[in-house]
């Protein structure tokens, strides 16, 4: 059972990086580790884990029993992957024909039981990307070509279809789902059992089937240190966008002066200009 060892770095280790340091590893004898797998320092591999293909796992990761990880996959440092997860498996896209697409996971993520994260497609980004400091609760599904930022929370049974983008500090409620190519902006909050068929702008709370806007995520912004003035400016922009019965172009024109004074509003303006599916209304 060959084990390769990787040099510790501050970023998720590249599959191509050579392993040159001497490491402290804890690997259960029932685990199956392929000869292309690269493990960092202090990695814990529990019973009946299967790791195959070009997989790189950074320092201080814990892989609980019965996890399956397939490559090409790069996993950063201090990630904790709980039992029965499937990480880096081939995507559920009928166009996929076995191309060597990838999954990249950052640092300090908690991935709870039965989560699934699939590699990308050549028709999409070619990779599925997960940032750092995220919590994926039980049964969360991250489909091919998704792009997930940092500091997000996905509650039980959250479902992301292919090509979805989730920006930083998003909270996703239990059983919520988002349509392929959808996007959720930074600091947004998606209610439990919500069905998203359109994009959710930054700071907005969304709920329902299909999801509608229900104000801004004021409590979340307060917890993250936004000033009262910035929160008021964000709410003013929200009112312009949703209460004045304007087109998106007209709303942007009225919100841009607010963003010039309060940079916290700029992500909303940028999001509105970039939205591909249109926003929830």
Where in this protein do the model-derived segments appear?
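Terminal amphipathic alpha-helical/low-complexity segments used for targeting or macromolecular assembly
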Residues: 1-30, 35-36, 41-42, 78, ...
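Structural signal for interior beta-strand "rungs" in well-ordered beta-sheet cores
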Residues: 21, 25-212
